[in-house]
């Protein structure tokens, strides 16, 4: 093991977990079986790594064994965060206090997931994306590289809100393309696509796809202007 026992009181590491070199643990961390933690990671107090999903009898979610949680080198997982089995985080990711990453998520390198963020199952997040505090990323979303999600953004994936059996085939989260930015408190309806380098203003309710470089505001969101050249990624 790569830590002095007296510096990680209450640490529980299940058989079959793989811990890299120079890993630092806080108090009362739980590492479930099969979890892989890369070199140089820091795990905060009361974090839970590799948790298996608990599904209701009525859930249609995938019930297959999700596989291990894998953390790339240099990840920082903060206090009280819960990361499920079957997800992968690339090198240098930061997960804030009390954040949740559900099963079968694929997260690139140097992604920031802020305090209290919930990333639901089967979501993909590209490298260098930032998701700020208390945002909700629903299941089956795609966020490409260099996306910025401001605090308290809500994404949705079910237009039928739990009614009709046919809804299961039509569940789809948002697609947010490279370099797009979504302002605080905005709401994205199911299946919405936010184009590359687009900008969604704070509090907007997005009911239609947003074209690349469009700046939209309001409820329902409407185009105000184009994103200026000086704000574009290189």
Describe each region flagged by the PLM:
Residues 213, 227-234:
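A glycine/serine/threonine-rich, flexible loop-to-helix segment
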Residues 2-217, 222-223:
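Structural signal for interior beta-strand "rungs" in well-ordered beta-sheet cores
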